[in-house]
Design a protein with these regions (language model features):
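C-terminal outer-membrane/trafficking sorting elements
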Residues: 7, 470-552
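Histidine-/acidic-rich catalytic cores in large beta-rich domains
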Residues: 20-464
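Solvent-exposed, flexible loop/coil residues
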Residues: 5, 277, 433, 437, ...
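Low-complexity, Pro/Thr/Ser/Gly/Ala-rich linker/spacer regions in secreted
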Residues: 459-475
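Sec-dependent N-terminal signal peptides
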Residues: 4-14
């Protein structure tokens, strides 16, 4: 009788019929960092700034689809990578940077695409107003052979160029770094850079990693070699971090050099991590990064301040194709260099923090994606494929979740499943961000339409008072996708037990979990309505219910 009463109350209370909540903000608790999140759907020219309930604060438009990352600058303008066609056609292609003011007016642009070079994936806006542009540069098969490449072919090594913007378009190049200046090869002593990669761990083995397509990033005729997908600048250290996906490594280089110095030994890698096999100091078993994206230094005030964090995509990871968020502390010395002992690889040997604690198939994006540390100690995660954005605490509990409703064919309404709604990366900015000063932050309705689910904003960042308030109400619970076909992810802000009933009150599944989310196989369930009841483990929390729909 108790279960039937619970079921009937749930069916009456929930606002939708057979369709459930499929897009927009699925979860927003008081433990999430309250701020404004950039959502930049990859297949469109639109960029939206939303609050934690998915309500739109501002929108910028462009004639170009997303070409990778975008950022808010401290004057309230949006800096965005744009996709343009050209001689280079690999995954993550950009080619143009645009800067638009708060009112969506173009105030500066840079075209960085010709037959010799092409911007891609990312850029970094520096405190001095300059911009670091990540780009491919062309090397012919003849140049590859002269550098010692076995089976030489067209290659696109990476370059980073610092540009001082001028006027409304373009700027002056003030610094450059080229990966091609820092090679090593062990195949021909008569060619430059001869030596064993293991003896030159600060250089890049010209014969490591495949080039081109064949299932990887880029087209069949691509010269994409390193496939860097992120660049991050640390002004305190005056160092640059680079994510090189094809090498499964993070590199750090010194920015405190002249361009001439950067072309010599001073421009060699200061540090590298993720795959010791890339420099002959390990094998496949030592690899810890698997097609990673994004890299950021964690800022001061965060529990892991000073460490590095990446989205470790996990394609080809032993055991499962599963993503993780990995944080580690590079062995930096007082002079800004990094410890390297004997013939050992760069450390460390253990993570400072990782999410989830055990990789699970329910969390996976084979490409794109990123992570941003939050001021309250949480991490904002972009699971790029499928446009899923969510926030987790230090304990691994999910406290905010959002599904991008906008894809290549427009915005879907609530209750419908989005298509091609990928998001390259996302960033959140707190209420005190300088770019918001004097701006109209009045929200309009969410992209997907009116919020009938009753999302509430939680502006207080006092986690103690937030927890106290949360004890007065049922915990927010969510299910995705809903309707579901074969697999269903259930999420709650704390551990507990899930009970799922069919419309006759029969118990279908019981699942006790210590994590924020759990994956349920529903492939064999008959089509129809179900009710999930979540009973929190913590005393004082009442149970909560959620309507589910199964439709094969």
């Amino acid at each position: 009788m108790k279960h039937l009463l619970l079921l009937s109350l749930a069916l009456v209370a929930l606002p939708f019929g057979i369709h459930g909540q499929t897009v927009g903000t699925l979860l927003n608790t008081e433990l999430a960092f309250d701020g404004y999140t950039l959502v930049d759907p990859m297949g469109t020219g639109n960029t939206h700034l939303i609050n934690n309930c998915g309500e739109v604060i501002n929108t910028w438009t462009s004639d170009f689809n997303s070409g990778g990352a975008c950022y808010l600058l401290e004057d309230g303008s949006l800096a965005r990578g744009c996709k343009v066609s050209g001689a280079f056609g690999g995954g993550g292609v950009g080619g143009r940077l645009e800067r638009k003011n708060w009112d969506d007016e173009l105030i500066w642009a840079l075209d960085w695409a010709n037959d010799e070079r092409h911007h891609h994936h990312d850029f970094a806006w520096m405190p001095n107003g300059h911009v670091l542009v990540l780009a491919w540069e062309l090397k012919t098969s003849e140049e590859a052979a002269a550098a010692g490449r076995v089976n030489p072919q067209l290659m696109w090594p990476e370059s980073i160029t610092e540009i001082a913007p001028e006027g409304s378009e373009g700027g002056t190049v003030v610094w450059e770094w080229h990966a091609w200046d820092h090679l090593v090869q062990n195949v021909d002593a008569s060619l430059p850079h001869f030596g064993e990669p293991a003896d030159h761990p600060h250089r890049l083995d010209v014969n490591f990693a495949n080039v081109g397509g064949g299932g990887g990033p880029g087209s069949a005729n691509s010269g994409d070699w390193m496939h860097a997908n992120a660049v991050n600048y640390n002004p305190t250290l005056d160092q640059i971090a680079i994510s090189a996906r094809r090498f499964n490594e993070i590199w750090i280089i010194d920015h405190g050099t002249t361009t001439d110095e950067a072309a010599g030994p001073a421009g060699d890698l200061l540090y590298r991590y993720g795959n010791p096999e890339a420099y002959g100091r390990g094998d496949a078993e030592d690899q810890v990064f698997f097609g990673q994206h994004d890299v950021q230094w964690i800022p001061e005030g965060h529990p892991q301040e000073g460490a590095l964090v990446i989205y470790n995509n996990g394609a080809g990871r032993p055991g499962c194709d599963c993503s993780t968020i990995d944080v580690w502390n590079p062995p930096m010395l007082e002079d800004g260099s990094y410890a390297l002992e004997g013939d050992a690889p760069f450390g460390p040997e253990t993570w400072a923090w990782t999410y989830p604690s055990t990789p699970t198939p329910g969390f996976f994006s084979s490409n794109i994606s990123g992570v941003q540390p939050q001021p309250n100690g949480n991490f904002l995660i972009c699971q790029g494929a499928g446009g899923r954005l969510f926030e987790v605490t230090q304990e691994g509990d999910m406290v905010w979740e959002y599904i991008n409703p906008e894809g290549n064919f427009g915005v879907v309404s609530q209750g419908n499943n989005p298509q091609q709604n990928n998001v390259f990366r996302t960033y959140r900015y707190g209420p005190s961000f300088p770019g918001f000063e004097g701006r109209d932050m009045t929200p309009s309705e969410p992209l997907e339409g009116p919020d009938v689910w009753g999302c509430e904003l939680h502006p207080s960042q006092d986690s103690t008072s937030a927890l106290g308030s949360a004890l007065l109400a049922s915990p927010a619970i969510q299910a995705f996708p809903n309707p579901a076909t074969s697999r269903l992810t259930l999420s709650a802000p704390q551990p507990g037990t899930w009970y799922i009933y069919n419309t006759t009150g029969e118990l279908v599944v019981t699942r006790t979990t210590h994590l924020a989310s759990t994956l349920v196989d529903c492939a064999s369930w008959p089509d129809g309505l179900y009710v999930a009841a979540f009973h929190p483990r913590q005393n004082g929390w009442p149970p909560n219910t959620l309507k589910l729909s199964i439709s094969h």
